[in-house]
UniProtKB/Swiss-Prot annotation:
The species this protein was found in: Oleidesulfovibrio alaskensis (strain ATCC BAA-1058 / DSM 17464 / G20)
Involved pathway(s): Organosulfur degradation; alkanesulfonate degradation
GO cellular component, as recorded: plasma membrane
InterPro entries attached to this UniProt entry: DctM, DctQ, TRAP_DctM
Keywords annotated in UniProt: Cell inner membrane, Cell membrane, Membrane, Transmembrane, Transmembrane helix, Transport
Compartment annotation: Cell inner membrane
Protein name: Isethionate TRAP transporter permease protein DctMQ
TM region(s), chain numbering: 38-58, 75-95, 117-137, 154-174, 192-212, 217-237, 266-286, 299-319, 350-370, 379-399, 431-451, 453-473, 481-501, 526-546, 572-592, 609-629
Gene Ontology molecular functions: transmembrane transporter activity
Stated role: Part of the tripartite ATP-independent periplasmic (TRAP) transport system DctPQM involved in the uptake of isethionate (2-hydroxyethanesulfonate), which is then catabolized by enzymes encoded by adjacent genes in the locus. Thereby is involved in an anaerobic respiration pathway that converts the sulfonate isethionate to ammonia, acetate and sulfide.
One Pfam family this sequence matches: DctM
Family classification: In the N-terminal section; belongs to the TRAP transporter small permease family. In the C-terminal section; belongs to the TRAP transporter large permease family.
Gene: dctMQ
Length: 635
């Protein structure tokens, strides 16, 4: 449920409830207010793509330029530091646009007045975290200046990369104050005071009681923040901060330390690269060429356009690695075309929404990257393990579409189809067809790591879109890079805050306690996996998949390991299960994206998608209880 690239409930508030930032200003001040962070994001994103692409190519080209194996030792470290900078610098942009991964199932049902009061609470809570990390990070930098440390490769003083924390959280505070000022004007004095009083009530227990058991604080505050509408990442960070204040089990500057070190990781960098690759290739015309090829192959059959749509979604999944990105890129092309050929618009939107969920199963997949990092499992094996469930889901959706279309009399398009037209479509789509070869071939051929393959895919998409197809203009290119940076930042910050939350859970032995409780009920593997699947299906209906993975992996993984489940197999189960949440009412993000493209009512669309969800559940059961099938390629 995450993202044009990553969001389960990416909330982009509109109308009366959204005019948070200050009014537009003319001239240079207005431009700075709207765009201050964006040039840094564009420069940083392009820099890390080029640096890691250079690292990958130089490793092999350098062999011929110099004797022996060649390696550019500085590239990875420099790319990691730039990656951390752009991840946090993108958050102020998200604040200004009010785009975040959040649970809004309760928020959306509130009257407008209470929604506006809720925004006051959200801004104050977020501002509290930003100000705290800003203050803590200044202490960290002071310590680095007093006791200098340098990075291994670049010999860079660590206070320089650590500067990202005061700079970015300072900018967040500025953007939040802008948003809060605008929200105060909307709410008026009385409702603003109500919001501030509610914030004080939220914080009061931490300062009134001498000691509070940390577990109720951790989970109680997190639940409260979700209900209020605080973004999930910020809720995790605030709940962790509240627990530190209440229990005193960790130093107060712990949050700032982990905010940096938790994402100082090369494998995590695959996420922005895969997102950028999907954005570049979608805007660069590759999705349209893939659809033409799929239509050439399947368009003559009953329900041919629906079959072509599913096939295109499956292949585009190997480019974008994202469900909503696939729905947005493919749905904007196929839903109008299906309606034009006589298909019901609700069926058209449902097919695209369900097929878009395959995007997180077929590699590359951002959820697999997140799980691999969280569980310390092989990302390469996870990628391979997602292939069979993704193909089974696609084939099941195709079979249903064929049967339903035949029943409704939706025939294929009648036109000349022969070897010449097929080869022409293949030739037109050749650059898109090369992407899985580059990514998967590079990984499983031992040529590149998943992160390097992702960087090369982003570089490839950029070159094809700008110079081969020439559909990425300067303006659209700039917007694409900003979009990719912003989307990936929401995921990265979520992982950062979830690491803090998870570390406190580990200190308080929460995973061990839950594992003992569940295993006390039964040690039967079938029953344990059934309970976990039901839990994930419930959570997937209201929480974004990536958030669920980073929160639940530390809790559930010890349980399945105790009953003998392979961690790679469990990762596949988890991702296939949470993929169903992309299309599960009431908050499946694929449904919302598809309904927006089709101009279809979400209530009616939710009914039409139910048979497709049933098919996806059948694939989940096969994936869970016949491990040889998903593990066929994963070994």
């Amino acid at each position: 449920m995450s993202d044009p690239n990553v969001t389960a409930t990416i909330m982009n508030a509109q109308g009366e409830c959204s005019s948070g930032s200050l009014e537009s200003r003319p001239g240079i001040l207005g431009w700075l207010d709207a765009n201050f962070e964006k040039p840094f994001l564009v420069a940083g994103m392009l820099a890390i793509i080029f640096i890691i692409t250079f690292q990958t190519l130089y490793r092999y080209i350098g062999v011929y330029l110099h004797e022996g194996a060649a390696a550019a030792v500085w590239t990875e470290e420099m790319a990691r530091f730039i990656f951390i900078w752009i991840s946090y610098l993108a958050v102020p942009v998200a604040i200004k646009n009010r785009s975040s991964i959040r649970v809004d199932i309760i928020f959306d049902r509130l009257p407008v007045r209470f929604q506006n009061i809720s925004w006051i609470i959200v801004d104050v809570c977020f501002l509290t975290l930003a100000a705290t990390v800003l203050w803590q990070s200044l202490d960290l930098i002071k310590m680095q200046l007093t006791y200098p440390q340098t990075s291994p490769a670049l010999q860079l003083p660590y206070y320089i990369p650590y500067l990202v924390l005061p700079v970015s959280f300072g900018l967040m505070a500025v953007r939040l104050l802008q948003d809060l000022a605008g929200q105060v004007r909307i709410c008026g004095a009385a409702d603003t005071v109500i919001g501030l009083i509610l914030c004080a009530v939220l914080a009061a227990p931490l300062f009134i009681a001498d000691y509070i058991d940390p577990l109720p604080v951790l989970f109680g505050y997190f639940a409260l923040f979700l209900v209020v509408g605080v973004p999930i990442a910020i809720g995790l960070g605030l709940a962790a901060l509240a627990t530190i204040v209440a229990a005193g089990s960790l130093p107060i500057d712990y949050v700032a330390q982990i905010a940096f070190t938790s994402i100082d990781s090369f494998p995590i960098m695959a996420i922005p690269f895969f997102i950028a690759a999907g954005v570049f290739m979608g805007a660069g015309g590759l999705s349209r060429r893939l659809l033409n090829l799929a239509d050439e192959m399947l368009g003559a059959l009953p329900g041919g356009m629906a079959l072509a749509t599913i096939g295109t979604c499956m292949f585009f999944a190997a480019i974008s690695g994202s469900g909503p990105a696939t729905v947005a890129a493919i749905g904007s092309l196929t839903i109008p075309a299906m309606v034009e050929r006589g298909y019901c618009k609700y069926f058209s939107a449902a097919i695209v929404a369900a097929a878009g969920a395959i995007g997180v199963m077929i590699p590359p997949s951002n959820p697999f990257v997140v799980y691999g990092v969280s569980a310390q499992a092989s990302i390469g094996k996870l990628f391979m393990g997602g292939i069979v469930p993704g193909l089974l889901t696609g084939l099941a959706l195709m079979a249903y579409s064929y049967w339903y279309s035949k029943k409704r009399g939706w025939k294929g398009e009648v036109r000349d189809r022969n070897l010449k037209t097929f080869m022409h479509a293949v030739w037109e789509a050749k650059w898109a067809l090369m992407v899985p070869v580059i990514v998967l071939g590079g990984i499983y051929g031992g040529i590149m790591t998943p992160t390097e393959a992702a960087a090369l895919a982003a570089f490839y998409g950029l070159i094809i879109g700008c110079f081969v197809h020439r559909e990425l203009s300067c303006g659209s290119f700039y917007d694409c890079v900003v979009e990719a940076a912003g989307t990936s930042a929401m995921v990265i910050v979520l992982m950062s805050m979830a690491t803090i939350f998870g570390n406190i859970m580990t200190i308080e032995e929460v995973p061990t306690t839950i594992a003992q409780a569940m295993l006390g009920l039964t040690t039967d593997k079938i029953a344990i996996l059934l309970m976990i699947n039901v839990l994930l299906l419930i959570i997937g209906t209201f929480m974004e998949a990536l958030a669920a993975i980073v929160i639940l992996t530390p809790i559930l993984l010890p349980i399945v390991l105790k009953v003998g489940v392979d961690p790679v197999h469990f990762g596949i189960i988890m991702v296939v299960n949470l993929a169903i949440g992309f299309v599960t009412p009431p908050v499946g993000v694929n449904l919302f994206v598809a309904s927006g493209v089709a101009n279809a009512k979400i209530e009616q669309l939710s009914k039409v998608v139910l048979p497709l969800i049933a098919l996806m559940l059948a694939v989940l059961l096969i994936t869970t209880y016949v491990p040889a099938i998903p593990m066929f390629f994963a070994g």
